[in-house]
């Protein structure tokens, strides 16, 4: 009997020691294994939430379109209903952002960059529900926004949530898990794991603290996020444009010309985004009623636009393969391009919860295809395929605007599965980036972050000035 009791006690002691070792391992922030395990958790959660966000947005869009189909034969009902449904959905997103989490407005990527520098707060308990539900409203309304920015911000906030739940207190763990979540978010949005890694290294290079632990954590999170995405959505490329032909060496100079065009377009586009933001700020002046009504009007107009010209509304993923296939004339491509520039400015600059990656990719596709079709007419001896210029244009506008050419190249190649076009992509994106920099253009996300920080400092200074003298001493 004593022997059985002794054996039982020995087993209990061994179990307690193992639990204590695991607990101490998880509490030691400097332990790479603990951070890597947490990175795997962050990547898995980001993949699950990213897939759920995609499905939720699609569900809202299908419900809205289904309601319109029911009254398609009655024009006097169709047009008002299209406006009202999209307006109400958009107003939900604008209201939630303005009321509960202003940092959830817009793309969210500048907020993650600011958080990596410890300059912006990460209130995940507010941002996660607001960004998810608000994004369902604005994207479901058919507004010209993408889901990649929200997914990146959601991923970063999930990283901070995991950090808080497991009480990891070191600055290294806090920074690493935030970056891991952001990279996993981009991977989950585009099914582009390598682009997710490069996005953190390239776009967030001023903020990302590169070391062996942090980069391994980012790799781990992106792997888990991609696995989750592919379990639910399969392994097919997210944009189906088919296998395009190679670009002959004697045509590569045309891709440099295309890059020069985007090098001019990028800074102009960025400037228009910032000016439109200022215009909206002057209009609503921070008043929630004006802001929500303004958002409802923009959402309603996008709903109407979706009836008139479906290609001019929505994020643009459905438009890209249609445009790249050469189904539109050059004139129609340019018309849709201009229309989508206007709608992108209105939707994104108004502060709606939604990204600008997908709209920029669509804009690049439209202009690239138009250039390719024109070049095919001017140089028939080259037997050009307009789709190859569409692929190059997708990455070029992003390279010129965001100033992340490597991310743009890899992202487009992963999304379209046309890796044979890597050389023309490099030429186009490099030309666009160099000219945009030469013209004095600033990276879009960095500029938005700088404006946010300036506004934050001004608000803090005003609070300090208005505070009683006793509180400042």
UniProtKB/Swiss-Prot annotation:
The record marks 148 as: Mediates proton transfer from the outer aqueous phase to the interior of the protein. Residues 70-76, 233-252, 310-329, 377-386 are periplasmic. A motif (Selectivity filter part_1) lies at residues 106-110. InterPro entries: Cl-channel_ClcA, Cl-channel_core, ClC. The keyword Mitochondrion does not apply. A motif (Selectivity filter part_2) lies at residues 146-150. It is a multi-pass membrane protein. Keywords: Antiport, Cell inner membrane, Cell membrane, Chloride, Ion transport, Membrane, Transmembrane, Transmembrane helix, Transport. One of its GO terms (molecular function) is voltage-gated chloride channel activity. The record marks 203 as: Mediates proton transfer from the protein to the inner aqueous phase. SUPFAM superfamilies: Clc chloride channel. The keyword Transmembrane applies. It is found in: Cell inner membrane. Homodimer. This is H(+)/Cl(-) exchange transporter ClcA. It comes from Salmonella paratyphi B (strain ATCC BAA-1250 / SPB7).
């Amino acid at each position: 009997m004593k022997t059985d009791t002794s054996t039982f006690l020995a087993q209990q002691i061994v179990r307690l020691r193992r639990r204590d070792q695991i607990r101490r391992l998880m509490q030691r922030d400097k332990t790479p294994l603990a951070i890597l395990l947490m990175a795997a958790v962050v990547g898995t959660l980001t993949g699950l939430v990213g897939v759920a966000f995609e499905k939720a947005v699609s569900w809202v869009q299908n419900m809205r379109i289904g309601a319109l189909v029911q009254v398609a034969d009655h024009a006097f009902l169709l047009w008002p209903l299209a406006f009202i449904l999209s307006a109400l959905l958009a107003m939900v997103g604008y209201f939630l952002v303005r009321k509960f989490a202003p940092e959830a407005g817009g793309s969210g990527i500048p907020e993650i960059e600011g958080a990596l520098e410890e300059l912006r707060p990460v209130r995940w308990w507010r941002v996660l529900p607001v960004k998810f539900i608000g994004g369902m409203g604005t994207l479901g309304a058919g507004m010209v926004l993408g889901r990649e920015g929200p997914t990146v911000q959601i991923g970063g906030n999930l990283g901070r949530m995991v950090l808080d739940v497991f009480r990891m207190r070191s600055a290294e763990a806090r920074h690493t898990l935030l970056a891991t979540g952001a990279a996993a978010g981009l991977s989950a949005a585009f099914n582009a794991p390598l682009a997710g890694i490069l996005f953190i290294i390239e776009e967030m290079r001023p903020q990302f603290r590169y070391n062996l632990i942090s980069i391994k954590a980012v790799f781990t999170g992106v792997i888990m996020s991609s696995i989750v995405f592919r379990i639910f959505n399969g392994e097919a490329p997210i944009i189906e444009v088919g296998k395009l032909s190679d670009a002959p060496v004697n045509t590569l100079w045309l891709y440099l010309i295309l890059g020069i065009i985007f090098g001019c377009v990028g800074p102009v586009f960025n400037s228009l985004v910032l000016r439109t933001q200022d215009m909206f700020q002057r209009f609503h002046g921070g008043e929630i009623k004006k802001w929500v009504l303004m958002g409802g009007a923009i959402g309603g107009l996008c709903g109407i636009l979706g009836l008139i010209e479906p290609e001019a509304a929505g994020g643009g993923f459905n438009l890209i393969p249609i445009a790249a296939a050469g189904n539109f004339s050059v004139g129609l491509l340019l018309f849709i391009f201009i229309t989508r520039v206007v709608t992108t400015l209105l939707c994104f600059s108004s502060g709606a919860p939604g990204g600008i990656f997908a709209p920029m990719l669509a804009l690049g596709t439209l202009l690239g295809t138009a250039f390719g079709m024109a070049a095919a007419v001017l140089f028939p001896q080259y037997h050009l395929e307009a789709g190859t210029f569409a692929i190059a244009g997708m990455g070029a506008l992003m390279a010129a605007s965001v100033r992340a050419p490597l991310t743009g190249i890899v992202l487009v190649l992963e999304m379209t599965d046309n890796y044979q076009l890597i050389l023309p992509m490099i030429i186009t994106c490099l030309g666009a980036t160099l000219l945009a920099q030469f013209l004095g253009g600033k990276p879009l996300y960095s500029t938005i972050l700088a404006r946010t920080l300036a506004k934050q400092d001004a608000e803090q200074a005003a609070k300090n000035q208005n505070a009683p003298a006793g509180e400042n001493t």
